[in-house]
């Protein structure tokens, strides 16, 4: 290499050094290209070019730079990171496995690749091995990542222990506060989740403002927090607030994974809030389905994990059911079962079970109850979820009202589920229908005894009181007066002025011990009437129905002929009087003819009616062929008779003029 080239290379490297220090990576790449044009084997220029491209996030262009295996060998970590950034996870993993001795940064990248491949067990094992090394236990970013992996793997206890060890760090970074909120959501602690999310949002705004970020950039960073806040409102039942939260995120058009989740969630919320509008306008369902399909395109699906994709596909199945596209729904269910049914994870089995429930609902609509029962029993026997078992009981009731089989399913439910108020109410109704009142009463008493043992909040106290009232009413209905009075007495001990339990207790005790009913008799409120009551009028109308019944009985027993008797009017009504209610006369139209019989063929055209046909036959009866001017044979005969009379009586008279005689009756006109 000549001296001039060496001097020029030294100058180029000085320029390259300045550009890299000043973070002018595009200019640095141009200098690298100049160096490589002079010396193509310069490893330093090649490495600088790759690093600059990675800094500019041009990972595909960086991968294209690696043309020789020696170049890949010299930069194995960088090459693997570029493959990871372009979503080529399997290639990146194989490249990392080729390394003989892995550095900590390679282990971190490997754990991140396993996380993207949703192999959470290997990710946790790598992170836990790194946790023992110096520097990692104090790293907030590393703790945040490990916490996220614990959440996705379903290891909530380990996540809670990790957060408890780093409580002080939760107020410093919004990512860790966000993960703490996600843990609270998984435990159904919505209040804690909401407070943690609001804390995360505040930390995010404060920290980014200090770093000089604009408001738009801060809002983009907060999209995941806003979507999670909307989800908390959704599971709490505040659908309008959650929809407003989702709409605010969608208006920003960030395009990250949180925005895709907001699109799916907003569709599910709108389908509930606007159900009446959607039922009358099927276009809403089709528009929603198109929006969900756009989320599953190749470009968008890389931002979603498999769990999120399952939820979107499940919502697509529900929309197809609403649109009555049964064949398309069945095809989608088959493809989803073949894709996720082979996996042995608990999430996948529950997802397949949800798909079975959709398929069963389609069979129920077609009244194929036996096929629906077989499908549920095939995959979900007694170990099935609550949804599938309750649906099986519903099928038994729909199929010839088989109460015994439905009760058999409900009785086999787990004790944590079988004593829920809704299921107990269903069992009581079915026991009552089957005539087994003892089991109905026992199931109510078991539920009440559970409430007696546990501590009750204000909401639980209200449920407990309503349960006591329902049990008392049921026992009162079936003449178990002592047991019913005990239920109402317990209600009155909680609230002595309960106006529902008070009269019910008096009614129940009056059947076996009237002295007990007098205990609360004085607490009954006095009835206040706005106006005076006419007792005679009440008695009068009260006896009307009884009198009508007596008259009906007398008419059935006596002969068809009836006799009427007149009685003198008294000032007070007696039992024999019947109050006659005056009925308004029916008003008839003035033009109405009472004896008029309408034509039965009035709905037909006139020429098709029977009377029109008779008139036509009568009219054509006398028509004959003859000369012009003569309508019928009777007319010609009368003319001949008249002529003969005139000739006989007036023989001596002169002939009448030609105008007085019929002209050429039998002559035909001759053609000229």
From Swiss-Prot:
Q: Give the UniProt record's GO annotations in the biological process aspect.
A: SRP-dependent cotranslational protein targeting to membrane
Family annotation (SMART domains): TPR (SM00028)
Could you list this entry's UniProt keywords, alphabetically sorted: Cytoplasm, Endoplasmic reticulum, Repeat, Ribonucleoprotein, RNA-binding, Signal recognition particle, TPR repeat
Q: Which GO terms describe its molecular function?
A: 7S RNA binding; signal recognition particle binding
Is Chloroplast included in the keywords of this UniProt record? no
Is Ribonucleoprotein a UniProt keyword of this protein?
yes
- TPR repeats (start-end): 9-42, 43-76, 78-104, 105-137, 140-173, 223-256, 269-302, 386-420, 421-454, 465-498, 522-555
Skewed-composition ranges (Basic residues): 581-590
Cellular location(s): Cytoplasm; Endoplasmic reticulum
Q: Which GO terms describe its cellular component?
A: endoplasmic reticulum; signal recognition particle, endoplasmic reticulum targeting
- Region annotation (Disordered) ranges: 552-672
Q: Where is the composition biased (Polar residues)?
A: 631-645
In terms of PANTHER family, this protein maps to: SIGNAL RECOGNITION PARTICLE 72, SIGNAL RECOGNITION PARTICLE SUBUNIT SRP72
Quaternary data:
Component of a signal recognition particle (SRP) complex that consists of a 7SL RNA molecule and six protein subunits: srp72, srp68, srp54, srp19, srp14 and srp9.
What is this protein's function per UniProt? Component of the signal recognition particle (SRP) complex, a ribonucleoprotein complex that mediates the cotranslational targeting of secretory and membrane proteins to the endoplasmic reticulum (ER). Binds the 7SL RNA in presence of srp68. This ribonucleoprotein complex might interact directly with the docking protein in the ER membrane and possibly participates in the elongation arrest function.
- Family from the record: Belongs to the SRP72 family.
Its UniProt domain note says:
The C-terminus is essential for the interaction with the srp68/7SL RNA complex.
Query: How is this protein named in the record?
Result: Signal recognition particle subunit SRP72
Organism, by scientific name, is Dictyostelium discoideum
The beginning of the lineage is: Eukaryota, Amoebozoa, Evosea, Eumycetozoa, Dictyostelia
């Amino acid at each position: 290499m000549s001296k001039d080239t060496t001097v020029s290379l030294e100058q180029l490297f000085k320029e390259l050094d300045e550009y890299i220090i000043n973070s002018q990576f595009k200019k640095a790449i141009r200098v690298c290209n100049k160096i490589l044009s002079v010396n193509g084997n310069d490893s330093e220029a090649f490495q600088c070019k790759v690093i600059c491209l990675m800094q500019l996030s041009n990972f595909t262009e960086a991968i294209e730079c690696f043309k020789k295996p020696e170049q890949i060998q010299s930069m194995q970590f960088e090459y693997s990171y570029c493959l990871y950034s372009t979503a080529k996870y399997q290639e990146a993993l194989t490249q990392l496995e080729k390394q003989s001795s892995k550095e900590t940064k390679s282990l971190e990248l490997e754990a991140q690749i396993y996380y993207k491949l949703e192999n959470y067990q290997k990710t946790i094992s790598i992170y836990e091995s790194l946790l023992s090394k110096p520097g990692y236990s104090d790293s907030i970013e590393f703790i945040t990542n490990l916490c996220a992996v614990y959440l996705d793997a379903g290891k909530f206890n380990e996540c809670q222990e990790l957060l408890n060890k780093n409580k002080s760090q939760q107020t410093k970074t919004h990512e860790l506060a966000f993960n703490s909120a996600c843990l609270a959501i998984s435990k159904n602690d919505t209040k804690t989740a909401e407070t943690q999310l609001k804390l995360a949002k505040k930390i995010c705004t404060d920290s980014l403002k200090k770093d000089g970020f604009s408001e738009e950039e801060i809002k983009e960073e907060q999209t995941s927090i806003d979507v999670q806040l909307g989800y908390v409102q959704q599971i709490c039942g505040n659908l309008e607030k959650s929809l407003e939260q989702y709409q605010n995120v969608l208006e920003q058009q960030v395009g990250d994974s949180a925005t895709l989740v907001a699109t799916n969630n907003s569709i599910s919320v709108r389908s509930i809030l606007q159900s009446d509008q959607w039922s009358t306008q099927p276009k809403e369902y089709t528009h929603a389905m198109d929006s969900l399909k756009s989320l599953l395109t190749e470009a968008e699906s890389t931002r979603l994990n498999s769990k999120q994709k399952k939820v979107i596909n499940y919502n697509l199945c529900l929309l197809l059911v609403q649109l009555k596209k049964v064949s398309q729904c069945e095809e989608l269910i088959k493809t989803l079962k073949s894709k996720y049914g082979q996996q042995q994870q608990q999430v996948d089995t529950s997802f397949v079970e949800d798909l079975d429930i959709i398929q069963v609902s389609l069979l129920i609509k077609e009244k194929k109850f036996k096929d629906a029962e077989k499908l549920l029993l095939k995959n979900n026997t007694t170990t099935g979820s609550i949804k599938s078992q309750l649906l099986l009981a519903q099928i038994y009731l729909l199929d010839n009202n088989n109460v015994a089989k439905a009760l058999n399913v409900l009785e086999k439910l787990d004790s944590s589920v079988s004593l829920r108020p809704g299921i107990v109410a269903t069992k009581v109704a079915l026991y009552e229908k089957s005539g087994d009142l003892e089991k109905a009463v026992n199931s109510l008493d078991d539920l009440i005894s559970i409430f007696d043992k546990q501590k009750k909040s204000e909401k639980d106290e209200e449920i407990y009181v309503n349960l006591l009232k329902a049990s008392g009413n049921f026992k009162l209905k079936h003449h178990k007066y002592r047991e019913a009075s005990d239920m109402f007495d317990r209600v009155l001990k909680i609230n002595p002025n309960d106006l529902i339990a008070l009269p019910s207790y008096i009614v129940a005790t009056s059947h076996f011990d009237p002295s007990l009913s007098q205990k609360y008799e004085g607490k009954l409120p006095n009835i206040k009437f706005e106006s005076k009551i006419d007792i005679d009028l009440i008695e009068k109308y009260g006896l009307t129905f009884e009198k009508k019944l007596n008259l009906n009985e007398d008419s059935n027993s006596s002969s068809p002929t009836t006799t009427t008797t007149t009685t003198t009017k008294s000032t007070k009504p007696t039992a024999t009087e019947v109050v006659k209610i005056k009925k308004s006369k029916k008003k008839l139209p003035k033009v109405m003819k009472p004896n008029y019989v309408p034509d039965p063929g009035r709905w037909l055209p006139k020429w098709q009616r029977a009377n029109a046909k008779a008139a036509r036959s009568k009219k054509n009866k006398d028509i004959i062929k003859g000369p012009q001017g003569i309508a019928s044979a009777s007319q010609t005969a009368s003319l001949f008779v008249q002529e003969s009379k005139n000739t006989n009586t007036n023989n001596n008279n002169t002939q009448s003029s030609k105008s007085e005689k019929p002209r050429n009756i039998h002559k035909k006109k001759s053609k000229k």
